[in-house]
Design a protein with these regions (language model features):
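Long, Lys/Arg- and hydrophobic-enriched amphipathic alpha-helices
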Residues: 1-156
Length: 156
């Protein structure tokens, strides 16, 4: 069989360094750091670099500066690095669950009532941000907090 197994996920120590610094900082000063990213609970296999231009996938190295670049974030590794530095970690939770717990539906309803001409736009944006078919499940939210602080909004 000539098929090669996919490479094991690579840990990237440089990626966790800023989180370790935040973790140490939250132990010295009462604060909370919110992380929101296209994330997973563990490292993805292979290269996850991708580009998005006008809401569509785009070749990452074509037309530099014209597209948004992203890569999957390993929230499992980041959470461990923050905990190892002494921070309290909340989440990750999906973006949809996070925004819902903050009351995004109530806000969307108020916006729609204030501007009936934009109801469709508001409904589409709400669905894109919160639905499992859109960014609601793809993006995750995690908070790093000082020990002793209450859970931040969205993580109660």
């Amino acid at each position: 069989n000539s098929a090669r197994p996919s490479p094991e996920p690579r840990r990237r120590p440089a990626a966790t360094a800023p989180v370790r610094r935040f973790g140490a900082r939250v132990c010295r000063h009462p604060l909370c750091v919110l992380l929101l990213a296209d994330a997973h609970d563990r490292a993805a296999r292979g290269d996850t670099l991708q580009a998005v231009k006008v809401h569509a996938y785009h070749a990452p190295l074509t037309e530099p500066g014209s597209a948004d670049l992203t890569a999957h974030v390993d929230f499992g590794a980041l959470g461990k690095a923050a905990r190892d530095a002494g921070a309290v970690v909340f989440g990750p939770v999906t973006q949809g669950a996070f925004l819902t717990s903050l009351g995004i539906q109530t806000r969307a309803k108020a916006l729609s009532q204030a501007s009936s001409a934009h109801v469709r736009e508001i409904d589409e944006a709400l669905a894109r941000l919160t639905s499992d078919e859109g960014m609601g499940a793809l993006f995750k939210v995690m908070a790093l907090s000082s020990p002793g602080l209450p859970a931040p909004p969205g993580f109660e």
